[in-house]
């Protein structure tokens, strides 16, 4: 009843009215009416105060929510540098309780990339995605799907590069990383396949290999300014002189980043940061051209670049360009913000690419790694000309082959 002061006020008015009727106890009614009226007034004020407090509390909650809102929005719009999404059928591969070791294997991939390429890969997020197929996985870089594949979690992948052992029963497929013909086999077939000399791997290895090669192919995209700063700060601990000379007086961290990205784009390791920074410190006084500075660094890293291309006889097998081809490319160089590129007509470009295709089919390269040797002037431009069609071809200039290495020319690109 006390929750309704308006009702009490009405009752007070009624009693006051009754007190004026002849024969009624006027004084008693007036006293009671006055008491009820005062009570109604107090209750009304209390209710207004309580309502005001409730409104103020709601406003404070709204304000607090608004204060937190920017943080929540930032969490929603932020993207991971790199992440792996898996279908629910592959969850056991990442579940330690089920014997899965995917998390540990991916952590080892980051260490492997640091050792081999010298890059700092941020922690790779792994999560399930119910929108994927049951046994599908995708690798994303900054929110964009780069590669994908499907696994058979309870089977093994058997690969035969020669494609001669086609009698093995199983599910025919294509190995996702290198595009080799493969077969998913039962686990009890492993011994039979290995006796035939075939390569047999588990599903986790298939995914981890795919992830590793994806990181190597897109390392330049993963190397941001923050990662470069971390690398430079590490170098500064032991080699402060070269870092202090170079940064920030001669080059910014962003400019160093662009040089490192150029190297990684052609799969040149950046582990030897001291040599890289020494070269930049020497040459950035003469030029600020990022492409030219990259070429100077490549010259300084010549032995590092050539090491995996040299066979046991200290020789390197290469394909060269016909002087006419070199002349055409050299005479049509155009400079842009993205670097130097050859402005060649489509017919000539097609003829060069077709000749490259023919040469690749006829030449055997060490470790099956095609190497093209061109003049220093056109090396960056020739690389840009072929990289969309032949991204895995190594393009070297004469400056990048050490003097104690024999050059064996096994093919020539002509038009």
Can you say where each PLM-predicted feature lies in the sequence?
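Transmembrane helix-loop junctions at the membrane interface of multipass transporters and ion channels
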Residues: 1-41
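Juxtamembrane/interface segments at transmembrane-helix termini
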Residues: 27-31, 42-55
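Membrane-embedded alpha-helical signal segments
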Residues: 47-415
């Amino acid at each position: 009843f006390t929750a309704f002061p308006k009702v009490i006020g009405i009752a007070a008015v009624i009693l006051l009215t009754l007190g004026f009727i002849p024969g009624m106890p006027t004084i008693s009614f007036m006293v009671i009416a006055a008491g009820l009226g005062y009570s109604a007034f107090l209750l009304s004020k209390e209710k207004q105060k309580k309502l005001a407090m409730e409104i103020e509390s709601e406003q404070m909650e709204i304000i607090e929510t608004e204060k937190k809102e920017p943080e929540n929005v930032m969490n929603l719009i932020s993207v991971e540098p790199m992440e792996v999404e898996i279908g629910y059928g592959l969850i056991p591969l990442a579940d330690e309780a089920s014997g899965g070791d995917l998390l540990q294997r991916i952590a080892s991939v980051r260490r492997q990339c640091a050792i081999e390429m010298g890059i700092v890969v941020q922690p790779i997020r792994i999560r399930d995605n119910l929108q994927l197929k049951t046994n599908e996985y995708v690798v994303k870089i900054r929110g964009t799907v780069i590669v994908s594949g499907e696994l058979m979690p309870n089977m093994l992948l058997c690969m035969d590069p020669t494609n001669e052992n086609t009698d093995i029963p199983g599910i025919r497929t294509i190995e996702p990383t290198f595009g080799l013909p493969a077969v998913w086999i039962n686990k009890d077939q492993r011994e039979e396949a290995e006796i035939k000399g075939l390569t047999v791997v588990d599903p986790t290895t298939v995914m981890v290999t795919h992830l590793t090669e994806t990181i190597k192919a897109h390392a330049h995209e993963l190397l941001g300014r923050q990662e470069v700063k971390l690398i430079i700060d590490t170098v500064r601990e032991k080699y402060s002189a070269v870092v202090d000379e170079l940064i920030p007086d001669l080059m910014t961290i962003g400019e160093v980043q662009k040089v490192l990205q150029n190297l990684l784009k052609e799969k040149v390791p950046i582990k030897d940061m001291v040599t890289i920074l020494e070269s930049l410190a020497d040459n950035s006084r003469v030029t600020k051209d990022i492409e030219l500075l990259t070429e100077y660094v490549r010259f300084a890293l010549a032995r590092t670049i050539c090491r995996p291309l040299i066979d046991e006889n200290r020789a390197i097998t290469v394909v060269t360009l016909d002087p006419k081809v070199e002349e055409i490319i050299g005479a049509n160089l155009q400079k842009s913000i993205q670097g130097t590129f050859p402005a060649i007509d489509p017919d000539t470009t097609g003829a060069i690419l077709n000749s490259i295709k023919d040469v690749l089919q006829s030449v055997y390269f060490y470790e099956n790694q095609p190497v093209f040797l061109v003049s220093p002037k056109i090396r960056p431009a020739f690389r840009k000309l072929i990289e969309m069609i032949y991204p895995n071809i190594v393009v070297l200039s004469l400056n990048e082959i050490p003097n104690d290495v024999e050059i064996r020319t096994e093919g020539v690109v002509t038009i």
